[in-house]
């Protein structure tokens, strides 16, 4: 049998020691492809098609090597030749196919499907430039294209195409296939569609382009700017390309396996991930009609085949489109949607549940709930809120459709790959079983009282912090003290996630330190977030944090105790560096607004403690670890919902009534900030906080300051107690494996392979 060194040298055509990193990377890509192809297995019974606008898959080389059982052999072979696998990984571009939690969840789910030997493929779009590449200049976010495609991409071009009609014009969707390896499991596929006519050269001045040149622009960017009509129309064009090509792929694959279309639900389960793929429902009905199936039967077939995952409590994220837009882009779907609307209106007199409302807007989530057999939330609290308030009318109409599937993460990437030193310590105590069965992490619990074990785990964290400090200096040009407490808030920039609450805390700390009240331990507060290009206030929050970072760094009294770092272009690669190094994980969304969150799970798994509200999956983390092992603060979801219902919240009352809060908000336009930042941005954010504050930052401010202070004190004054809490969090993280989530989806909704 060939050694790994011999295998790689044969692929490259020369000795490893003489090979470049690029040559080794391409050889490993070929090796992974051949090994993963051997794990493709025939489909018996029902197969899942997971349709999602985004898949934030991250770099694939190391993940695939781990899943295929090749990682150690490859690492050792390279080391023997004086090469580093981490250097080879740098050659790989990160795929620009997703942005936030929605896309990362989809990627984790694909990993778990393959690991559990379940037949399940993804369907999405092959974006050329992703959301955008973020850079900072003059304290402001700039957006640039984020290219990743090249001739050596993991996504392989096929000869398979499907015709798609957009605004009455014919287009041809090209299929690309990306292999998804499971850990000691099967290989599934992520199917990505694109147009051969896309022209990357039309992008100029950052991420500007002609939004009307559909043949050239359709898959350039994920979530193109929708601040104008052309941008909103472009999103519909994108969504229809994805679902029309995807529906044709599904029907073709099922037909090849013997499906006669009447029995489609026996061959396919389709999961609609949020509302972006909703048009797959009328498109499938339309296509089945072309196969000669009557409308009512087609509706039943599609309803039995499709299921819908709701990911939000924010009304703004429940997509609705003006009927006039759909009339223009997908006129072939409108007769179907009108019939579905009429059928829905026969089921209920509640006009709030209509698909087409009185203002001629088409509600995608309403269509999903009426014409799928399952609607699930993604955390226990989220599902409860959907049932009791946000979607209560639908719950009364279809109680049997509603269910909860608490989100999860793949431990292969978020532990095995990104924290190998921690894995080594865990295995030395409980063996390797947790790699396949995350619940086995609970075997760590007895070691929570073992000071020697706690010290070893603490040393892993210290080494990870040093590694992050080195990475920050190398990639961001920022020096940080690795012995300080690392406090991290990394997630999409949105007011409901409340980076602005963290901002106000940091300003408060600035004043406290200047007054001589130094914290229990130096604090490095690290942010990673992109703001949507048209989301002005979110970009103002970024500007305020970058400006505050300058002000603090220039103050000799404050700088030794407090540092603010904003990581540029936060992505999966950055997350893999930051998460293992985190001490305190910021999960501070306004209670009732975060559906689940999965960053909270990743930080917990890697031994960080959570500072958070009782929102999303924080509730279930608290239940798992116990209130004494998490730092909870702020209003409850019930209090928040009541405050919205009564409509009595006036931020000015809190601003006037709390001198510390007023001081922090006033500082935004104080001389120190104005000397380092831009008045327009800072004043606009200040005005927003004083007069609107839609996500109730001010009422939670004092509770946040107190609880965060307690966390800092515990970290500094009771290191043994802190370490014990960290180990308990790791041991209780098994519930949040996406393997558990996918097993629940399969047993309750999909019934794959049956």
Regions found by a protein language model. Give the residues of each.
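A conserved ligand/cofactor-binding region detector
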Residues: 1-754
């Amino acid at each position: 049998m060939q050694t790994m060194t011999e295998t790689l040298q044969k692929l490259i055509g020369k000795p490893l020691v003489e090979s470049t990193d690029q040559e080794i990377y391409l050889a490993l890509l070929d090796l992974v492809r051949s090994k993963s192809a051997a794990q493709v297995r025939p489909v018996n019974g029902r197969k899942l098609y997971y349709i999602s606008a985004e898949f934030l898959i991250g770099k694939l080389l190391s993940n695939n090597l781990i899943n295929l059982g090749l990682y150690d052999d490859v690492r050792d072979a390279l080391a023997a030749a004086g090469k580093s696998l981490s250097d080879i990984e740098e050659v790989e571009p990160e795929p620009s196919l997703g942005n936030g939690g929605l896309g990362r969840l989809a990627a984790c789910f694909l990993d778990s499907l393959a690991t559990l030997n379940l037949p399940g493929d993804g369907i999405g779009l092959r974006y050329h430039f992703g959301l955008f590449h973020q850079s900072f200049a003059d304290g402001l976010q700039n957006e640039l294209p984020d290219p990743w495609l090249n001739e050596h991409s993991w996504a392989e071009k096929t000869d398979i195409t499907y015709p798609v009609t957009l605004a009455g014009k014919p287009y041809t969707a090209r299929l690309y296939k990306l292999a998804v390896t499971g850990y000691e499991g099967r290989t599934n596929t992520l199917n990505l569609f694109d147009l051969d006519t896309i022209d990357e050269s039309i992008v100029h001045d950052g991420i500007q382009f002609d939004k009307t040149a559909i043949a050239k622009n359709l898959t350039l960017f994920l979530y193109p700017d929708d601040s104008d009509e052309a941008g909103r129309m472009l999103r519909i064009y994108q969504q229809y390309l994805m679902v029309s090509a995807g529906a044709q792929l599904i029907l073709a694959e099922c037909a090849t396996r013997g499906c006669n279309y009447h029995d489609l639900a026996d061959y396919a389960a389709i999961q609609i991930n949020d509302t972006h793929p909703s048009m797959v429902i009328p498109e499938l009905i339309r296509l089945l009609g072309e196969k000669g199936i009557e409308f009512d039967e087609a509706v039943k077939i599609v309803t039995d085949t499709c299921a819908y995952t709701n990911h939000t409590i924010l009304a703004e994220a429940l997509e609705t489109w003006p009927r006039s837009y759909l009339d223009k882009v997908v006129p072939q779907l409108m007769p179907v949607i009108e019939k579905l609307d009429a059928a829905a209106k026969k089921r209920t007199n509640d006009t709030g549940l209509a698909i087409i409302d009185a203002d001629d807007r088409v509600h995608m989530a309403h269509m999903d709930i009426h014409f799928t057999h399952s609607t699930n939330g993604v955390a226990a609290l989220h599902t409860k809120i959907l049932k009791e308030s946000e979607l209560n009318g639908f719950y009364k109409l279809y109680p049997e459709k509603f269910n909860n599937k608490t989100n999860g993460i793949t431990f292969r990437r978020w532990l095995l790959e990104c924290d190998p030193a921690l894995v080594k310590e865990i295995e030395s105590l409980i063996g390797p079983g947790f790699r396949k069965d995350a619940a086995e992490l609970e075997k760590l619990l007895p070691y929570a009282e073992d000071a020697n074990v706690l010290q070893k785990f603490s040393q892993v964290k210290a080494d990870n912090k040093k590694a992050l400090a080195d990475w920050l200096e190398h990639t961001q040009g920022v020096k940080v003290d690795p012995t300080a407490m690392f406090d991290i808030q990394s997630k999409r920039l949105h007011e409901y996630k409340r980076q602005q609450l963290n901002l106000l805390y940091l300003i408060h700390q600035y004043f406290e330190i200047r007054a001589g009240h130094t914290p229990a331990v130096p604090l490095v507060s690290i942010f990673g977030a992109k703001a949507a290009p048209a989301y002005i206030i979110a970009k103002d929050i970024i500007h305020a944090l970058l400006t505050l970072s300058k002000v603090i760094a220039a103050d000799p009294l404050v700088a030794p105790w407090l540092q603010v770092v904003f990581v540029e272009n936060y992505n999966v690669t950055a997350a893999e560096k930051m998460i293992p190094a985190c001490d305190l994980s910021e999960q501070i969304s306004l209670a009732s607004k975060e559906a689940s969150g999965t960053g909270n799970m990743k930080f917990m798994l890697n031994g960080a403690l959570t500072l958070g509200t009782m929102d999303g999956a924080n509730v279930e983390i608290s239940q798992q670890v116990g209130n004494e092992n998490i730092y909870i603060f702020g209003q409850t979801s019930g209090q928040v919902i009541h405050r919205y219902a009564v409509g009595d919240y006036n931020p000015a009352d809190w601003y006037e009534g709390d001198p510390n809060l007023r001081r922090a908000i006033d500082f935004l336009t104080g001389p120190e900030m104005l000397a380092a930042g831009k008045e327009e941005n800072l004043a606009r954010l200040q005005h927003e906080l004083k007069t609107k504050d839609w996500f109730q930052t001010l009422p939670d401010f004092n509770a946040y300051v107190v609880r965060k202070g307690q966390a800092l004190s515990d970290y500094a004054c009771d290191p043994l107690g802190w370490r014990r809490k960290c180990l308990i969090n790791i041991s209780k993280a098994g519930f949040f494996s996406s393997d558990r989530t996918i097993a629940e989806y399969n047993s309750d909704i999909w019934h794959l392979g049956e």
